[in-house]
């Protein structure tokens, strides 16, 4: 498994948030972009893992198929602008679950929807501990195996001490 480039992941997250920033969509924010970058560090430690080892989660954002289906059926279907922003990236006949597995842009967009559905506010891009709290409560959930401390450690081991989220890298 190779390590993912944090700047390349940031570019995907920028594109995902930009693609959702349509009338009736989800406004793009630096907080959201960084939360998505942090999530890749928290979930896979920046490693190229697209399918959870011993589990169902998919993509670098490790989204479970049940979560993807729930997002589509109970949230996206009532927000046609956001649904259209995502589904326009799917190949004809491709399910959203397959899209999350096959296309990092789609995966990042769905991860953004997971965070948007949460009542929690996103935090400033340079607040790594705050991002960890949001990740644990809104994404990994209190019942999930991950801890805030482990998430910060995995993220920092991936990006290194000189990575600055506000300027997109070193």
Where does each model-flagged region fall?
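Short, structured coil/loop segments at alpha-helix boundaries
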Residues: 6, 29, 75, 79, ...
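Ser/Thr/Pro-rich, acidic low-complexity intrinsically disordered regulatory segments
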Residues: 1-25, 137-140, 144-146, 160-170
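Peptidoglycan-targeting cell-wall enzymes and recognition modules
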Residues: 2-11, 15, 38-120
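Secretory-pathway/luminal and periplasmic proteins that interact with or process carbohydrate-rich
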Residues: 44-51, 140-149
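Alpha-helical scaffolds flanking conserved acidic
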Residues: 29-38, 126-134
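C-terminal/domain-terminus segments
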Residues: 122-145
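Active-site or metal-binding loop neighborhoods of secreted/extracellular toxin and effector enzymes
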Residues: 153-154
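Short helix-to-loop capping/linker segments positioned immediately adjacent to catalytic or ligand/cofactor-binding
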Residues: 22-28, 96-99, 120-123
């Amino acid at each position: 498994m190779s390590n993912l480039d944090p700047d390349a992941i940031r570019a995907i997250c920028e594109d995902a948030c930009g693609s959702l920033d349509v009338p009736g969509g989800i406004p793009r924010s630096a907080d959201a972009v960084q939360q998505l970058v942090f999530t890749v560090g928290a979930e896979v430690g920046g490693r190229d893992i697209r399918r959870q080892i011993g589990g169902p989660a998919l993509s670098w954002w490790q989204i479970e198929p049940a979560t993807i289906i729930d997002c589509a059926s109970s949230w996206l279907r009532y927000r046609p602008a956001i649904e259209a922003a995502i589904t326009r990236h799917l190949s004809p006949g491709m399910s959203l679950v397959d899209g999350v597995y096959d296309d990092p842009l789609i995966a990042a967009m769905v991860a953004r929807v997971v965070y948007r559905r949460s009542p929690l506010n996103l935090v400033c891009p340079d607040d790594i501990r705050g991002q960890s709290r949001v990740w644990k409560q809104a994404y990994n959930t209190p019942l999930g195996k991950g801890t805030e401390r482990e998430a910060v450690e995995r993220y920092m081991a991936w990006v290194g001490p000189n990575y600055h989220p506000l300027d997109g890298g070193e």
